[in-house]
């Protein structure tokens, strides 16, 4: 676990492969259109809890799996970003449900270790095209909701995105105080 934190703060981590298809800027909102590769992901689903609370419970499970709590007892190293799917309600607030997605590192894509925790599932995910808006700070549910609304407004008349789900992402460990990177991803319809 300390190795993962050290690498996240001072070293390099594997980035989820994507290709920037285009960049845009509208209403002071700069965004990218990206084609994100699919692959195998470790997932944890949480329900009946607000997003921030659900994340505090789900993230340690994923970190333990990545750190070696698996059938092979090996630490895999981090990939970024860690993303979580959120599900909007009418009016823009979020349902009490989320799904954390951690992309298995390339070295383990063909044969990922089996999680020791039964609540973690290994799932194959297709590639997706997203519109991404980056922002800093310690992101909370309200920040993601606000940024998603800004991005939707900026994309009006330009792109059609799914309204039933979007992704919130983080690139940094919780103890990194400055230069934090978060993104909201709207999925192209």
Swiss-Prot record:
InterPro entries associated with the record: Reg_factor_effector_dom_sf, SOUL_haem-bd
Gene Ontology cellular-component annotations: cytoplasm
UniProt entry keywords in alphabetical sequence: Cytoplasm
Major place of residence: cytoplasm
Single annotated GO MF: heme binding
Short name of any one Pfam family annotated for the protein: SOUL
Compartment annotation: Cytoplasm
Domain notes: Forms a distorted beta-barrel structure, with two helices that are packed against the outer surface of the barrel. Porphyrins are expected to bind to a hydrophobic patch on the outer surface of the beta-barrel structure.
Family: Belongs to the HEBP family.
Protein's job: May bind free porphyrinogens that may be present in the cell and thus facilitate removal of these potentially toxic compound. Binds with a high affinity to one molecule of heme or porphyrins. It binds metalloporphyrins, free porphyrins and N-methylprotoporphyrin with similar affinities.
PANTHER family the UniProt entry points to: HEME-BINDING PROTEIN 1, HEME-BINDING PROTEIN-RELATED
Subunit organization: Monomer.
Annotated protein name in UniProt: Heme-binding protein 1
Species: Sus scrofa (Pig)
Biological classification of the source: Eukaryota, Metazoa, Chordata, Craniata, Vertebrata
């Amino acid at each position: 676990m300390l190795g993962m934190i050290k690498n996240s703060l001072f070293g390099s981590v594997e980035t989820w492969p994507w290709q920037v298809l285009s960049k845009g800027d509208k209403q002071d909102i700069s965004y990218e259109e990206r084609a994100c590769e699919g692959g195998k992901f470790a997932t944890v689903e949480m329900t009946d809890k607000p997003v921030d609370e659900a994340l505090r419970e789900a993230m340690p499970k994923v970190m333990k799996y990545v750190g070696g709590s698996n059938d092979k007892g090996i630490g895999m190293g981090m990939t970024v970003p860690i993303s979580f799917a959120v599900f909007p309600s009418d009016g823009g607030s979020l349902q009490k449900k989320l799904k954390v997605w951690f992309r298995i590192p390339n070295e383990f894509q063909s044969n990922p270790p089996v999680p020791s925790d039964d609540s973690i599932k290994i799932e194959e995910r297709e590639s997706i095209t997203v519109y991404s808006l980056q922002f800093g700070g310690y992101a909370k549910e309200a920040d993601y909701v606000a940024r998603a609304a800004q991005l939707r407004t900026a994309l009006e008349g330009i792109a059609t995105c799914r309204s039933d789900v979007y992704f919130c992402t983080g690139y940094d460990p919780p103890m990194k105080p400055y230069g934090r990177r978060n993104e909201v991803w709207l999925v192209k319809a």
